[in-house]
Amino acid sequence: MTSISVIKKDITSLTVDAIVNAANSGLRGGGGVDGAIHAGAGPGLMNECAAIIEKNGLCATGSAVTTSAGDLPAKWIIHTVGPIWGEEGEERSSLLLSSCYKSALDAASNLRADSVAFSAISTGVYGFPKKLAAPIAVSAVCSWLEAHQRAEAPSSIFLVCFDEENFRITKAVLDRLGPNNTPWVRTEGQ
């Protein structure tokens, strides 16, 4: 059975099968978590990302692609491009954000990743309101789990929050669900 946990950590320090990067469409590395992941993974990551872009073009918002994790303790990085708040309407942005989580879980399933750690997609420089993003993230993960066989699903999913505000908001969403409403939820402290 899969567990969903919220933790407050630096995603680049986690020893998991896959970490999910909040990437830009060119996979170039940027600010926030994207920049930290690129810096931690080393120069080989930029070469892998450039090869993906050369072959497939820019990554669409809501899609996901996979690379090795380079020098990070994870095995893989799943790069997903979140919506930039204000570029689309709220409904479309919410659907795209949900698609990020589902696409990343599809990629994790294809990798047979047993543990996956998500950054809080689009809540940094892309400006998606944290109070809207957290319920979308949790809902997307839960609906993906409901639609897939246990053999396809990771056994551990971590919603990783770098800042206290995201941690509190996401923990509150998971606490409201609780184990009585979904078999997957387990919240953790810092």
What is each residue range found by the language model?
Residues M1-N110:
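Glycine-/small-residue-enriched capping loops at alpha/beta junctions
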Residues W85-Q190:
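Phosphate/ribose-phosphate-bearing ligand recognition and processing surfaces
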